[in-house]
Swiss-Prot record:
This is ATP synthase subunit c. It comes from the Bacteria. GO terms for cellular component: plasma membrane; proton-transporting ATP synthase complex; proton-transporting two-sector ATPase complex, proton-transporting domain. The keyword Transport applies. Signal peptide: none annotated. F-type ATPases have 2 components, F(1) - the catalytic core - and F(0) - the membrane proton channel. F(1) has five subunits: alpha(3), beta(3), gamma(1), delta(1), epsilon(1). F(0) has three main subunits: a(1), b(2) and c(10-14). The alpha and beta chains form an alternating ring which encloses part of the gamma chain. F(1) is attached to F(0) by a central stalk formed by the gamma and epsilon chains, while a peripheral stalk is formed by the delta and b chains. PROSITE patterns: ATPASE_C. GO terms for molecular function: lipid binding; proton-transporting ATP synthase activity, rotational mechanism. The lineage of its organism: Bacteria, Bacillati, Bacillota, Bacilli, Lactobacillales.
């Protein structure tokens, strides 16, 4: 049962992060197309946003490992 819970935790985190990264990058590219002179600042902000979104699957993996190796 712990393995199923771990798999669901990782799956949910991966799907959510994939969707979130897609939205962040999509909106950044859209903004760069509207204002090319802001592309440097937008790119920096995008990388920060992607890093924050990627924290979710990392936490999902940690929770999954706790579920699998819990006594």
């Amino acid at each position: 049962m712990n393995y199923i819970a771990a798999a669901i935790a990782i799956m949910g985190a991966a799907i959510g992060a994939g969707y979130g990264n897609g939205q962040v990058i999509s909106k950044t590219i859209e903004s760069m197309a509207r204002q090319p002179e802001m592309s440097g600042q937008l790119r920096t902000t995008m990388f920060i946003g992607v890093a924050l979104v990627e924290a979710v699957p990392i936490l999902g993996v940690v929770i999954a490992l706790i579920l699998v190796f819990a006594v």
